[in-house]
Amino acid sequence: MPLLVDGQRVRLPRSAVELVRAHPPLEERARLLRGQSVQQVGPQGLLYVQQRELAVTSPKDGSISILGSDDATTCHIVVLRHTGNGATCLTHCDGSDTKAEVPLIMSSIKSFSEHAECGRLEVHLVGGFSDDRQLSQKLTHQLLSEFDKQDDDIHLVTLCVTELNDREENENHFPIIYGIAVNIKTAEIYRASFQDRGPEEQLRAARALAGGPMISIYDAKTEQLRIGPCSWTPFPQVDFWLQQDDKQILESLSTSPLAEPPHFVEHIRSTLMFLKKFPSPENILFPGNKALLYKKNKDGLWEKISSPGS
């Protein structure tokens, strides 16, 4: 069945602006979200989701109470939630393979909601802006189209993307919202930023920059964050890129150079350094080709635990 808004079938294709004009409650929800102040989210109880990652859990989780992601410029952050059992998935999509990613998001939630007798699937899309290359617009269209193709009814509750998430300053465009968090217990979605993006922030960023596909990073049954094992081919011309100045890196390695947060270039440089240091990560970063496992300790912070079978 299709994508629905307030019980009505969504007519596609149409732009985000056309969609909210046809459904005023969507426009109001986007306005309220844009109007919020940004909350700084601390590490306790947080599961931070990087680009090309997804995480899913439920209110029964004793370790995780918040899912979040930020630094989205042309990217979109997607939250899919089952209202019956509260199972919630958050993912950071960059448009690399939306056709494969949406079914992955759906199956991650449905693995929780098989036994839910009531409730419905609700989706929230946030991110992007009116960028010159129209990458945000393309991703908005892809996500709406792919959710509309799924077998289940999916209710579009929040749409704050592309033109609806755009501000203009000195004739340049920027996103209004760069990051959001969702409270697993209350289902509240709010504007957020994060200082702690771990664990293994550089490794996870390197995997995405090297072209890795969307992956699920959390096992809610064991309440463990699981990374890898993953591999990548040596990053092409890594020494060349590390020799470039900040302006060149920003203009060449960003989808939206003017709209990036201040730490973007520093983040790219450190990720490139990591890729140079570990051109083939398999046995060095993943001893015995086993995953790296982390669990929240009693203070709500990530702690490394031994790999399975070690």
UniProtKB/Swiss-Prot annotation:
It is an enzyme of class 3 (hydrolase). GO terms for molecular function: protein-N-terminal asparagine amidohydrolase activity. PANTHER family: N-TERMINAL ASPARAGINE AMIDOHYDROLASE, PROTEIN N-TERMINAL ASPARAGINE AMIDOHYDROLASE. Keywords: Cytoplasm, Hydrolase. Monomer. Its EC number is 3.5.1.121. N-terminal asparagine deamidase that mediates deamidation of N-terminal asparagine residues to aspartate. Required for the ubiquitin-dependent turnover of intracellular proteins that initiate with Met-Asn. These proteins are acetylated on the retained initiator methionine and can subsequently be modified by the removal of N-acetyl methionine by acylaminoacid hydrolase (AAH). Conversion of the resulting N-terminal asparagine to aspartate by NTAN1/PNAD renders the protein susceptible to arginylation, polyubiquitination and degradation as specified by the N-end rule. It catalyses: N-terminal L-asparaginyl-[protein] + H2O + H(+) = N-terminal L-aspartyl-[protein] + NH4(+). InterPro entries: NTAN1. One of its GO terms (biological process) is ubiquitin-dependent protein catabolic process. It holds the Pfam family N_Asn_amidohyd. GO terms for cellular component: cytoplasm; nucleus. It is found in: Cytoplasm. Its main location: cytoplasm. This is Protein N-terminal asparagine amidohydrolase. It comes from Mus musculus (Mouse).
